């Protein structure tokens, strides 16, 4: 028997001088998947394919990622505007389930808090965490800067492919500092979301073999979720024995 395939359609969303490639396929309840920083539709292909078996899935690339065009701004608000443009311009028969991974989870919470009734619910994957302490601070800044400079260097080998990411190491660092600030007040955003919220979180966010700094980051990550659940005990939370790459490694 031949394998069953799902028909997909590709469109472009134009806004703010940026072209966002959008792919839609599957059948069922509408679902919009917002990727994270340094993550593309191509990276999330396995997850997208699985979701299409039960949902009408809309997937896209954020500015500077995949085949989306580059931009002059890579701020939190700029990425939020990409998500808003997709949700505004793609015609859906009913409010979608909004799934966000990493940075995409933070964008999803902000969008839902600003557009009551525009989404049916949120599924947040390892992001939008009201951590009690910022991640990029003090002695860790140098280590993060080196890590993201190395990532940007490796990303250059992907230019012209569906997995390319155009941000520099400094732009990645600056955005993560901004995300720390966003998460310091995100509890207020959660209080304005009156739709079902589910979370899928990594138990070892920083990964294995990263020493005391990694263990401290993991404790901070878990403490943030505990803080959220005290404020919103209705949020359903699942912990996976995985690191922050869980959307790529644990899609099945």
List where the protein language model places each region.
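Active-site loop signature of alpha/beta-hydrolase-fold enzymes
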Residues: 39-40, 65, 130, 207, ...
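Conserved hydrolase catalytic core segment
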Residues: 94-136
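Alpha/beta-hydrolase-fold catalytic nucleophile elbow
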Residues: 61, 125-126, 200
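Active-site loop/oxyanion-hole signature of alpha/beta-hydrolase fold enzymes
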Residues: 23, 58-99, 141
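Conserved HGGG/HGGXW glycine-rich cap/lid loop of the alpha/beta-hydrolase fold
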Residues: 18-69
């Amino acid at each position: 028997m031949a394998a069953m395939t799902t028909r997909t359609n590709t469109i472009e969303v134009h806004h703010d001088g940026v072209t966002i490639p959008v792919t839609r396929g599957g059948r069922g309840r509408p679902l919009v998947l917002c990727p994270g920083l340094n993550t593309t539709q191509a990276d999330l292909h396995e997850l997208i394919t699985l979701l299409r078996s039960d949902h009408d899935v809309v997937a896209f690339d954020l500015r500077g990622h995949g085949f989306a065009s580059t931009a002059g701004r890579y701020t939190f608000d700029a990425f939020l505007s990409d998500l808003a443009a997709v949700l505004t311009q793609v015609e859906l028969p009913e409010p979608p389930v909004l799934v966000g991974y990493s940075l995409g989870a933070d964008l999803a919470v902000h969008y839902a808090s600003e557009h009551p009734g525009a989404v049916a619910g949120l599924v947040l994957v390892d992001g939008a965490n009201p951590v009690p302490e910022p991640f990029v601070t003090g002695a860790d800044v140098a280590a993060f800067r080196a890590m993201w400079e190395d990532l940007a260097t490796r990303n250059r080998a992907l230019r012209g492919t569906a997995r390319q990411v155009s941000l520099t190491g400094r732009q990645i660092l600056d955005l993560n500092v901004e995300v720390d600030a966003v998460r310091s007040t995100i509890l207020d955003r959660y209080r304005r979301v009156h739709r079902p919220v589910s979370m899928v979180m990594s138990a070892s966010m920083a990964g294995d073999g990263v020493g005391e700094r990694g263990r401290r980051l993991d404790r901070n990550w878990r403490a943030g979720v505990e803080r959220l659940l005290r404020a919103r005990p209705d949020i359903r939370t699942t912990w996976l024995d995985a690191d922050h790459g869980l959307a790529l490694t644990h899609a099945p």
